[in-house]
Amino acid sequence: MNIIEAAVATPDARVAITIARFNNFINDSLLDGAIDALKRIGQVKDENITVVWVPGAYELPLAAGALAKTGKYDAVIALGTVIRGGTAHFEYVAGGASNGLAHVAQEAEIPVAFGVLTTESIEQAIERAGTKAGNKGAEAALTALEMINVLKAIKA
């Protein structure tokens, strides 16, 4: 039996982060967590990290796809926050972002890490952006790095 596992340290990784401006008071913390994890744990060099801001979570798949198609990046990290309101808007935005990002990963064959919070309240979002429930931006960054190494091991 063969088992493939990989570490997260990826010093030569080239990583793009696409991040939504909408709810930026939460997303800024996700970005800080992602960049900290990339540099501190993944040992990624500052010059190998690109950050692209988009209006909202719904635009993340388009930006992620454009970044992936350049061939310049080993992974893309998508960060954003969608908070449920009183209308069906939440389902459309959260579903569109999730499905779109999964499609980009499958088409581009590079990791596209999902760091989009989909919460019932602002309080839940704040908890997941660096307080009680950790930082989902950092978790997405570590997922991206591990998947870079997993794919390398599969192809080796």
UniProtKB/Swiss-Prot annotation:
Keyword Transferase tagged: yes
Protein's UniProt keywords contain Ribonucleoprotein: no
GO cellular component, one term: riboflavin synthase complex
Metabolic or biological pathway, per its Swiss-Prot or TrEMBL entry: Cofactor biosynthesis; riboflavin biosynthesis; riboflavin from 2-hydroxy-3-oxobutyl phosphate and 5-amino-6-(D-ribitylamino)uracil: step 1/2
Keyword terms, alphabetized: Riboflavin biosynthesis, Transferase
Active site feature: 89
Matches recorded under InterPro entries: LS, LS/RS, LS/RS_sf
Binding site for 5-amino-6-(D-ribitylamino)uracil: 22, 57-59, 81-83, 114
Record-level GO BP terms: riboflavin biosynthetic process
Function of the protein: Catalyzes the formation of 6,7-dimethyl-8-ribityllumazine by condensation of 5-amino-6-(D-ribitylamino)uracil with 3,4-dihydroxy-2-butanone 4-phosphate. This is the penultimate step in the biosynthesis of riboflavin.
Subunit structure: Forms an icosahedral capsid composed of 60 subunits, arranged as a dodecamer of pentamers.
Protein's recorded name: 6,7-dimethyl-8-ribityllumazine synthase
Source organism: Enterobacter sp. (strain 638)
